[in-house]
Amino acid sequence: MSYVEKTLKALRSYRKISEWNHFAKEFEEVYEGAKELGNDEVEQVRALSDRYFSRVRGEVNKDDLNEEELEAFTKLEEVMNKIKYEEL
């Protein structure tokens, strides 16, 4: 299974806020693996993660999150920013 396929699988799996910590960890692992395969895989993972997180960010009101959910959201945001902005 390619890293892009793994990314898509992860995106479909983690819909609940309570699962975001696990999702962030898994997504970071997918990204690190994609870096080993080259720029094409990385760019595909970046595009998918950016689309996903843009949607999540638009749907989530941070004021409505409890402490655990806010922590999970912040971790996911950190991982997504790393994927989006890290220079290779």
Regions inferred by a protein language model and the residue ranges of each:
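Coiled-coil-like amphipathic alpha-helices with heptad-repeat character
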Residues: 1, 7-10, 15, 41, ...
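Amphipathic alpha-helical binding modules
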Residues: 54-88
